[in-house]
């Protein structure tokens, strides 16, 4: 049987003045997912590749299992930012909405605070520029990880 997903972990240097608390950013995707965890002096990124599934229930279960696999040992309350819809995109919006809902439900079950923010709002908060994309700033990171990092930073500032 083909594996359902592959997770690559990246630990990067912490920023100056790291925020106090646990902040999680998620760039949802139907095939590629980025997850970022900001915690004390750690910045941990996960680049996830998911096998495409036609079954929405399987996709939602996979999303929750992936989140639990990446974020399993934090006992603290967290704020989770899930990147919302980009209104210019037309493809796979239903599947992306299911991913967002499933990830939000995962976080709510852990009593985490959940925010779903549009990409422009995240960019304005983090970069003071709604057009500047995360992968244009952090060129050394996978695009999904860079987007997830900007999500986590958006709710930490």
Language model: regions and residue ranges:
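Phosphate- and other anionic-substrate recognition elements at nucleic-acid/protein interfaces
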Residues: 1-157
